[in-house]
């Protein structure tokens, strides 16, 4: 039986590879992610990974949000708060990375 393997590689560069807002997550999902009282959750992945620290700073300064998870090695960032606050933080963080650090940006998505 042949199994398909997927290998994810990071290439040198500065980019936001994922920026997704989950509005009104289900209770089970929010609990599994580790943010049980979240009205909204934002998931971002960035390269290089250390950018997650800068993105977390930008997000917290942009709106009343909290950091649920930040990994400077993989570039993963999860923020949470109210829908309006998380959406504003996501918009400001992504645009700030593009404007200040000349990052390549991805499309912002929402569910």
UniProtKB/Swiss-Prot annotation:
This is Bacterial microcompartment shell protein EutS. It comes from Salmonella typhi. The keyword Ligase does not apply. It comes from the Bacteria. PROSITE patterns: BMC_CP (PS51931). Pathway: Amine and polyamine degradation; ethanolamine degradation. One side of the hexamer is concave and lined by hydrophobic residues, the other side has a slightly protruding, 6-stranded beta-barrel. It is found in: Bacterial microcompartment. NCBIfam families: PRK15468.1. A component of the bacterial microcompartment (BMC) shell dedicated to ethanolamine degradation. Its unusual hexameric shape may help form the BMC shell. Targets at least 2 proteins (EutC and EutE) to the interior of the BMC. Proteins such as EutS containing circularly permuted BMC domains may play a key role in conferring heterogeneity and flexibility in this BMC. Residues 5-103 form the BMC circularly permuted domain. Keywords: Bacterial microcompartment.
């Amino acid at each position: 039986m042949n199994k398909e393997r997927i290998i994810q590689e990071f290439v040198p560069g500065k980019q936001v590879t994922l920026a997704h807002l989950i509005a009104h997550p289900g209770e089970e999902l929010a609990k599994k992610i580790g943010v049980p009282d979240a009205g909204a959750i934002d998931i971002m992945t960035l390269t290089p990974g250390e950018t997650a620290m800068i993105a977390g700073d930008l997000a917290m300064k942009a709106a009343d949000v909290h950091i649920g998870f930040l990994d400077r090695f993989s570039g993963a960032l999860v923020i949470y708060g109210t829908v309006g606050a998380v959406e504003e933080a996501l918009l400001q963080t992504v645009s700030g990375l593009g404007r200040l650090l000349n990052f390549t940006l991805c499309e912002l998505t929402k569910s």
